[in-house]
Amino acid sequence: MNMLNKTVGFILNPLFLGMSIIAIGMVLAICRRRKMTIWCMMAAVAWFWFWSMPITGSWLAMPLEKDFPVQLAEDMPTADAIALMGGGVGGSTNYPYAMLRDGADRAWHAARLWRAGKAPIIIPSNVGAELADIRLLTDLGVPKDAVVLETKAENTEENAKFVRDILLGSGGVVEFNSPTHLFIHSPTSKPKVLLVTSACHMKRSLYMFRKYAPEIECIPAATDYQALPWKDEPFKWRHILPDIGAFAHNNSFIHEYIGYYGYKWFR
């Protein structure tokens, strides 16, 4: 299923489709179909322009983020752990510090929740050999003994499964000084997890946790909002002008839709 999602995602990627339109136009030019070639190239320009507009991103991100309003860390409920979805922090074994990328707000928000006393441990998922997430978390004041590594997951489905295994597979969450549980594997309540990820990724992440880790009560703690800054901003011409950064973000939103509906409809 993961390979199918990746294949479909590659085919439906706006960059791939745009290059396909250009390739068709080149074939038509070789075949001396001048009028068709012009129409094809105009379509390619319009296609890339649309997917490069910042305002397109707000249209795409809004449906993904609308169910997860902003919540202050201080107002979040207490839980047994903070599940931190990876992808926002990079690193290198040749460099001693974490390198921040788009989505680094995730690690910041996880540390913010921990410092607010909302859970005793943070479980970063998809941690690479360079352990960049740990480097950033410790820089933000989280001690190493409050970080429980999950290093095997390669996608969001495995994130959910392996976080579940960490919480339930070694005696229950009581060993983590759980603030919400009194008994190991309590039959009347579930371990609680604050799920931290980008707001546009939350819909898919929450679906995966509820499907593949039903033993866990998952509470969304979204951050890194993309549509929110547009909510009250007046129209500006730059919103409809091409921007390479907007093109990359819009590609990632399409990836979220494919990932979510691919699992929901075909798994």
Where are the model-predicted features located?
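Membrane-interface helix-boundary motifs at transmembrane edges
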Residues: A29-T37
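Structured C-terminal subdomain patch of bacterial secreted/periplasmic proteins
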Residues: L241-R267
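Structural signal for membrane-spanning alpha-helices in multi-pass inner-membrane proteins
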Residues: M26-A29, F48, S52, Y263
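A structural signal for short, hydrophobic/glycine-enriched beta-strand patches
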Residues: W49-H239, D243-A246
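Internal/C-terminal transmembrane anchor helices
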Residues: I38-P54
